[in-house]
Amino acid sequence: MERFGLVGLPNAGKSSLYNALTGSNALAAPYPFATKDPNIGVAKVLDPRLDALAKMSESKKVVNATIEVVDIGGLVEGASKGEGLGNKFLANIREVDAIVFVLRAFVDDDIPGPSDPLEHLRVVELELALADLESVETKLGKMQKAARMDKSIADEVAALERAQKQLADGRPLYRAGISDADRELLAPHFLLTTRRVLAVVNVAENALDTIPAQVARVAAELAPPGSASEHEVEVLGMSVQIEAEEIGRAHV
């Protein structure tokens, strides 16, 4: 079963989205680090086509595919250097197969920090890239020395060198359009930014009409047309509060 990790700044709506997807009741509070240890649950992948087929075949039981959803504590600027939940937060991300960025696009006087999803995206991407850069540089020095005697690791070293160059610019690896060969070579190093990415722009309940514009802004930055990440990243918009009610009912 694949694991999807919900990642974002504090109070972006991660726990509310987790509850909606899994039918859980994890604490969702308007203060930082309400989630310290990750919440883990299972979500059904609802597919109308499956329901239609079941109806046609008169099946009594429909078995939906499932994914594991991990609600990871809020990331803050400086996490790669230990700020906030620091290394614990980053370690939790390393255990997932895909990352879901939850980006806040609503104003709430009780929640500190920016309400611009692009600012949320900037902080999250930079911290993940810096964490990967530190990991790559730590391993690369040792492996470059070893490669002088062991030519069998030359390709792996070259992949790490390419990754280092990209990360040093503060850009996640998924933006580079990682080749399948490099992805395989980098897999043993569990780099955060080699994972698949989905971005969810979370708008206010009374601002559904802003979704197309907000999604377009984030997509233009995260996966612009013609870029390496265009087909690597998907951007969705929603009001998590509304989805919590609608998706929650589907789990009843």
Which residue ranges define each predicted feature?
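Conserved C-terminal guanine-recognition region of P-loop GTPase G domains, centered on the G4
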Residues: 60, 84-245
